[in-house]
Amino acid sequence: MSNTTVEQFAAELKRPVEDLLKQLKEAGVSKTGGGDSLTLDDKQLLNAYLTKKNGSNSSTISIRRTKTEVSTVDGVKVETRKRGRTVNIPSAEELAAQVKAAQTQAAPVRPEQTAEDAAKARAEAAARAEARAKAEAEAAKLKAAKAGNKAKPAAQKPTEAKAETAPVAAETKPAEESKAEKAQADKMPSKKPAEPKEKAAKPKHERNGKGKDAKKPAKPAAPAVPQPVVSAEEQAQRDEEARRAAALRAHQEALLKEKQERQARREAMKQQAEQQAKAAQEAKTGRQRPAKPAEKPQAAAPAVENKPVNPAKAKKEDRRNRDDEGQGRNAKGKGGKGGRDRNNARNGDDERVRGGKKGKKLKLEPNQHAFQAPTEPVVHEVLVPETITVADLAHKMAVKGVEVVKALMKMGMMVTINQSIDQDTALIVVEELGHIGKPAAADDPEAFLDEGAEAVEAEALPRPPVVTVMGHVDHGKTSLLDYIRRTKVVQGEAGGITQHIGAYHVETPRGVITFLDTPGHEAFTAMRARGAKATDIVILVVAADDGVMPQTIEAIAHAKAAGVPMVVAVNKIDKEAANPERIRQELTAHEVVPDEWGGDVQFIDVSAKKGLNIDALLEAVLLEAEVLELTAPVDAPAKGIIVEARLDKGRGAVATLLVQSGTLKKGDMLLAGTAFGKIRAMVDENGKSITEAGPSIPVEILGLSDVPNAGEDAMVLADEKKAREIALFRQGKYRDVRLAKQQAAKLENMFNNMGETQAQSLSVIIKADVQGSYEALAGSLKKLSTDEVKVNVLHSGVGGITESDVNLAIASGAFIIGFNVRADASSRKLAENENVEIRYYNIIYDAIDDVKAAMSGMLSPEEKEQVTGTVEIRQVISVSKVGNIAGCMVTDGVVKRDSHVRLIRNNVVIHTGELASLKRYKDDVKEVRMGFECGLMLKGYNEIMEGDQLECFDIVEVARSL
């Protein structure tokens, strides 16, 4: 940028030097003589002053000049109206000093781009100062403007002239104006590159048409008639802008004060928190450390900083100054690209200053903390649901997933980050990693059931007792019930043994009694446990001629576990070998003491075959029921337990339900485990259709969506939607738990089987009439497994044999067991075509024996030695290139050509091998019998002597059995 003197500029304009000095003085530029230097800023101030003074109607304005001048002044608009700075307003003398300082700082001349940046920085700094002066002056003249006074000459308001947008003022003569403009353009070649950026800084309200003076070309003004600077309408608009600026300043001052108070409060809270933390730490560790003095808040930066301008960094410094001044961006709630505020990036008040280039650390203000690592590990309380993935468990403990995987691998489980584990395993992992694990109550709809149970209250009335008959197999349980019911159930049972739970109710002169008949066979443990769970009183049947047997002891354990009183029926006392006293002694050893011996258990000697003392047994049962005072609500939704369940081909899922409370009616919505449905039919134990059943009455129900598990609790719900929701939730929950346990079992088997030879597997598919039967059969077959042959139950279910069962058997090479069920025609045809074996049974013994035989056939045969003869060596003949030949006498049995032999010397086995050749005289023979001589050679062995004995034997394979 080149400077000119006042005289040179006056010569270019063809104006007297005195007039030019006068106009400069009126414009706020203090020049005393013609030799004083004029800068570009001085010329701009003079230009703005003449524009205001003479009007804006010139038609010879250069486009380039218009862009340059408007852009520079537009920056003032942005800083004044949009940013609304909260600053200290300097006086007119201070403004002049600042302008002079800016001119002095810009004295060193650099290349064009550097000069452009420096000029722009100075112009914007001066414009900000002028904007403050303008705001103060306009506020002072607000009353005069409202009274309708005309604006004073621009010479009395130099700062006001600089704050308005206007084109270059025209001189009185167009010729002089043209020459001046041409000379100005020749003198300032470095201004042109700055035009695009300055144009980009043009405020939005100017582009929308608010700066109307900038868009119209100026017309020549008459020198004799002075023109008003602005119209009354424009003056009113400016007054309104001034009022808004004053209100904005007041608001910003309030915000600044509030921010300072907030910082002070935060500092106090920070100091207090630090002191408390240090005190707690010192109390814990026993170390006393001096308290850290509180940091003082930084003093507020001055509103306008007149720093020396470095032209190379003028743009960056200017942007930083604008962001640091006041709260221009913060007041609007946005700043920078994307509306993001750098100063309030985190909490709106913490100001961060980045220093220097890459690699410099972030400098924090006093109200910010650097992150401090925790001094001790944090212990979390982890709520663990029934199943949880490894990733979720790690998230709950706030640790990395790899730590959980590592802990599980130490426990012998190979898992992935997305794999589910069961609740027990997860609790162990939580404890292992130092946290507190608690089983979480599932957020399931089953809570509705408890709420509904509490809400329903009905009068409890006496109910019949539920009596379960238990005992060892063939001790006469069903025969006893037959006599009580006057029926012949035993004759209809396969093999004379009970394989289902039978539920009956019997009317006696003293009331109704419900009986549950449980199987006595060892395979039906689960059935006996379910019977004890649903019962009030247990009748323990013991045969007087047989004594206490394993299932008798098991029945005692079930009764004690359920907390149920017992009545002992000593059966078969009509037999000659009956010894009731021995039964009492044996049961006393198992803590079942007769009442006549000082105990609390009634012993009744009965005969189911002849009906002896049956009435006394029923009296004892009813006496126990009176002591228990059994009651249940009648007028309430029914609740009960599933005793047995099966799949009937014609009727669908059929379940035997023992009602425990309430009244079950036809059409009720029943929920039983994972099955639900509306009761379509109810049948009693005699096959008669009934419409309702009260407490302690067993019924057979139809209409469930699936076959429920035996032992499940069942209850009536009023809402089908709620029943469906709970059933589906249970299905998903049980599936997740089952999969998690299966995965754990697979991994355990994988580790256990590492390095072992692969055992043979016998695959079997079991279909039975009721759930209890296939449970018992599957459990018994699995017990037959050995290290060499294992029973693999691929599928077990209730109902007839279907095509899907046959197809599964084809794919897996299994055979099918039908227990009290049959295959339909299509299934039989498919099985015949594919050679799939289907075996039907109605006695559990037979099924177990056949499977055991099949497993025995899969066992590898056992090799045994069978001695065939004995040979005595009487002469040894050595033949070159052949070896030693033994001349022998067969003393016992027979010697065969392919026999194995043992060489025995002095009753010690020297060698075991085979014969290389066997001859009698010169002929090869297959065998030589006792009493004949022979010659023989041993294969690969020549160390034989006279007097040695040879023991001949064969190796035979013997089939093994389980």
Swiss-Prot record:
Compartments reported by the entry: Cytoplasm
Keywords: Cytoplasm, GTP-binding, Initiation factor, Nucleotide-binding, Protein biosynthesis
GO molecular function, one term: translation initiation factor activity
G5 as annotated region, ranges: 607-609
Binding site for GTP: 471-478, 517-521, 571-574
Region Disordered, residue ranges: 99-366
Chain positions covered by the region annotation G4: 571-574
Region (G3): 517-520
Region (G1): 471-478
Domain tr-type G residues, every copy: 462-631
InterPro entries, per database record: DNA-bd_dom_put_sf (IPR009061), EF-G-like_DII (IPR053905), IF2_II (IPR044145), IF2_N (IPR006847), P-loop_NTPase (IPR027417), Small_GTP-bd (IPR005225), T_Tr_GTP-bd_dom (IPR000795), TF_IF2_bacterial-like (IPR000178)
Keyword Nucleotide-binding tagged: yes
Matching Pfam families: EF-G_D2, GTP_EFTU, IF-2, IF2_N
Bias (Low complexity) ranges: 145-155, 219-234, 270-283
GO cellular component entries: cytosol
Function: One of the essential components for the initiation of protein synthesis. Protects formylmethionyl-tRNA from spontaneous hydrolysis and promotes its binding to the 30S ribosomal subunits. Also involved in the hydrolysis of GTP during the formation of the 70S ribosomal complex.
Family the entry assigns: Belongs to the TRAFAC class translation factor GTPase superfamily. Classic translation factor GTPase family. IF-2 subfamily.
Listed PANTHER family: TR-TYPE G DOMAIN-CONTAINING PROTEIN (PTHR43381:SF5), TRANSLATION INITIATION FACTOR IF-2-RELATED (PTHR43381)
Protein's name in the database: Translation initiation factor IF-2
UniProt source species: Neisseria meningitidis serogroup C / serotype 2a (strain ATCC 700532 / DSM 15464 / FAM18)
